[in-house]
């Protein structure tokens, strides 16, 4: 599975929905995420991609869509490799 597929699988699992969201769709507006699910999802992302997303970065806009989540994960993966 590529990065986007892994992220999508996490979002679907956390949301308990049966369908996958469109990569640009608002996960909050579509009911995939709320503030409680966001923290669970971030924890899953950190485990899956072996990254650490600081609490100060937990702005819902960073996690608005699959595409935005992919950008955020890539940012922290690049930072982990640079260390």
Enumerate the predicted regions with their spans.
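Catalytic nucleophile serine of serine hydrolases
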Residues: 35
């Amino acid at each position: 599975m590529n990065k986007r597929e892994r992220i999508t699988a996490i979002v679907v699992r956390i949301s308990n929905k049966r369908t996958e969201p469109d990569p640009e769709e608002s996960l909050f507006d579509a009911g995939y995420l709320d503030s409680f699910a966001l923290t669970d999802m971030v924890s899953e992302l950190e485990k899956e991609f072996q990254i650490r997303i600081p609490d100060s970065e937990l702005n819902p806009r960073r996690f608005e869509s699959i595409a935005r989540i992919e950008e955020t994960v890539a940012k922290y993966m690049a930072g982990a490799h640079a260390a």
